């Protein structure tokens, strides 16, 4: 009952924040009605409610795909150039405008988190309560403010720094990137000093995992931040890689206390049957109570639109990245090994994503069970058969009293999208369409409910191991442990014969034990890309890695050329494929970052381009 009361108070507070989603929205705020720290923070219950409200804001940064669209710039993800996917396709092509819904939502929703965090930072000290409870509130606020600025600075570059609830601050000039990072580091250091390593009460801990952020998660984040500062655009180099290694190593060295693991089977990493697992070091919890607040709406995002089960097709796998991807359990868990077609809850056919049939394939049509619906269905099918009677191209037929539809047409692509398909967020269903909590199997029927309670993996323990290994190599530290951690990550991910052999970017295959520091650093960088491929909710996505290594230009130039990729061979026949989203024009550094949202530029002249 106490938890429900606190959640209710938190929801009331969250409601007060909904109106002011973005930096610019504050400019329309009436000061007389403003929720201030002095008005809200009175009791310890207010502290918990404020953190609940903060997490309500955090959930919305990832509930649906829009705020994550900037991650489509990475070389792992691409988009449908048509349908209703123009927003993510524009970002995939490094050609977004300020009115793009992905740009607007990324900006608005992360600044909404910042506002909620600022309210806590500026007000929690007013509570007459225990310092421990106040520290928890401060720590969560400092952490998620840092996290939000970390997201924004990598997506937009220079951004306004807003640290309090004073509306006079909200026409601020965008701060330099270095200044934003200085604030991020300070907030994370504060969070590390304020946060516990474990919670023992609800709602901070649920399902045997810490829902609220912990000290070790803040340390891991600081390691990632230092790595970003070491690379592009600040290029602080060796010193900051050493700082990153220190933070990551401290988490690793204390893991006997924390209990993080690498799931033995890679299929369990994203499994709904393993939703609250011990590999996730930082997650965002969700439930499925309704739309647009704290559910996960990603379960239909990976399935292609053409497959018959209501897939949204928001993210397609980039072809060249998929082709380079090491074979093994990890690839089979991230990509569909076969593409299935579905009618209701029945799989009607399957194929490789590149297959082109040599003859037509007809499949049975699933008939309705309700008498009235069946009568209507039969009437519609008969009318279609009659309409196509004199046409060379028929799509429906009746054979021995059974209705069939043309699924694959001779000489035409079986899968219209003609791309690899991710399975990270996809879930299986039972015969009635209900969601199954088990590792995803690409050959079984797919859940089409669209909303579920998936816990989003922002940081996994495998990433911390790789961050340490790469940073140690780039900082000139001892390589023995770094090599061990790289092998540890690969042991469950790739085929056993390939664990010790890594293909580097120049195509050379190097045994891990024989690697020098530069080769090991590159191997770990590449490996992290395989680990987070297609997982656009990761704190450090493939796009973020490419930004740090200043390789987005390389990705852009490859996409402009768009040379055909040989994806499979069958005897003398070669199958080739090209990317569908067109990327054109010359490269310039400003293509790296998204433009400021148009609406915010109208309110704050300092955000005009």
Q: Over which residues does each language-model region extend?
A:
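Short, surface-exposed recognition loops and adjoining beta-strand edges that mediate ligand/DNA contacts
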Residues: 38, 64-82, 165, 196-216, ...
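Bacterial Sec-type N-terminal signal peptides, specifically the leucine/valine-rich hydrophobic h-region
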Residues: 17-20
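Conserved, well-structured interaction surfaces
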Residues: 44-64, 82-156, 170-182, 188-203, ...
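Short coil/turn linking the two alpha-helices of tandem helical-hairpin repeats
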Residues: 153-155, 160, 199, 228-235, ...
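Acidic, glycine-rich segments characteristic of secretory precursors and extracytoplasmic regions
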Residues: 2, 23-73, 104, 109, ...
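Structural register within alpha-helical repeat arrays
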Residues: 138, 145, 222, 229, ...
